[in-house]
Amino acid sequence: MKYESKSLLKIVISYMLFGFFWIFSSAEILHSITRDMSTYIILERYKSYFYVILTSFLLFKMIRSSYFKMEETNRKLQQDIVQSFITALEFHDKYTKGHSEAVASYSTEIGEALGLKGHELDDLYWAATMHDIGKIIVPIEILNKEEKLNDREYKIIKDHSKIGYEIVSKNDSLKKVSKYILYHHERWDGMGYPEGLKGDEIPLLSQIISVADSWHAMTSKRSYKNQLTCEEAIDELINNKGTQFAPKIINVFMDLYNSNEDAFMFEKSH
């Protein structure tokens, strides 16, 4: 807000100074352009139009510059906030270290292949980075339990998407991506959580994160499960296409994987 106020004040002062300059100097400028009285009269008649055009252009340039600077400042602040969240989560559970980064990387690859651009691709990146932030309230003994979870423990685990939604929606600059976090455990067949959304009722960005999240979870080491080979994980994705996962997303993922397997072997490259 302080930056925005300073930028607006700068624009207003610049506009006022140019206005005063034009009022007191425009006649001299016209005289320097021409000594012919008929030409001078024509220029005098149209100088107000010229002033409007010139100041409009200058205002546009200044506002545009201010906007981009503000965007960069907000993005840096947003990045710092997200990194604080992720650092806290990784401190809480060492097995999540690198998971958020990997899911964001995979999700972005898929999003670009689907033609996402600009703010939509940014939203995907931030949502994927923070998709598991709600796990920060899940007791570590439940997160890393090797035995099958009981009903109470499973409910606590499932609540992490709701908690993540609540955390992120409280931040003005991030709340627009909170719904993608909320729905990243929905299933294509409607058997997911928290709301049992089905098919394209599930937001596209959540569909993407679901596949990226599952891929990294299957191909990563965890205390409570065996790490799958890439071939085994591919089989799981294909076998659950149209049930757990959106067919379109799986098709895109397979195309990307077949063209560049190394891009989807995060554990080996980090």
Give residue spans per PLM region.
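Generic detector of contiguous secondary-structure segments
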Residues: 15, 69-70, 163-166
